[in-house]
């Protein structure tokens, strides 16, 4: 299993979140998941909201096009990005096969 997959025009990411980091950044792979460090604390949904905003900015989409599919109260999360406009340089990330 890869840390991402395409579902039509949507990109699904399997993430491992590290809250309360010194800066927001991708930190390589953590097993079969993309490790993401965020400055937000893991309280009252702040880290989740920060994650969605961070990914929206990186993939060039409005925040409304990024949603948490699973892992609301866990470090292991699955996120859907609807029709990403840009792809960051991440290990193994390839454009949609039919693009």
Swiss-Prot record:
Record-linked InterPro entries: DUF167, YggU-like_sf
Residue spans of biased composition, Basic residues class: 76-85
Segments for region (Disordered): 66-99
GO cellular-component term (any): cytoplasm
HAMAP family: UPF0235
Homology family: Belongs to the UPF0235 family.
Entries under NCBIfam families matching the protein: DUF167 family protein
Protein name stated in the entry: UPF0235 protein Avin_03050
Organism of provenance: Azotobacter vinelandii (strain DJ / ATCC BAA-1303)
Source organism phylogeny: Bacteria, Pseudomonadati, Pseudomonadota, Gammaproteobacteria, Pseudomonadales
């Amino acid at each position: 299993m890869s840390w991402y997959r395409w579902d039509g025009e949507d990109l699904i990411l399997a993430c491992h979140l590290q809250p309360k980091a010194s800066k927001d950044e991708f930190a390589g792979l953590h097993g079969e998941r993309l490790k993401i460090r965020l400055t937000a604390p893991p309280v009252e949904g702040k880290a989740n909201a920060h994650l969605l905003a961070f990914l929206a900015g990186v993939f060039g989409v409005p925040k409304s096009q990024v949603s948490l599919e699973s892992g609301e109260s866990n470090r292991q999360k699955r996120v859907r990005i609807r029709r990403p406009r840009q792809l960051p340089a991440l290990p193994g990330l390839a454009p949609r096969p039919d693009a």
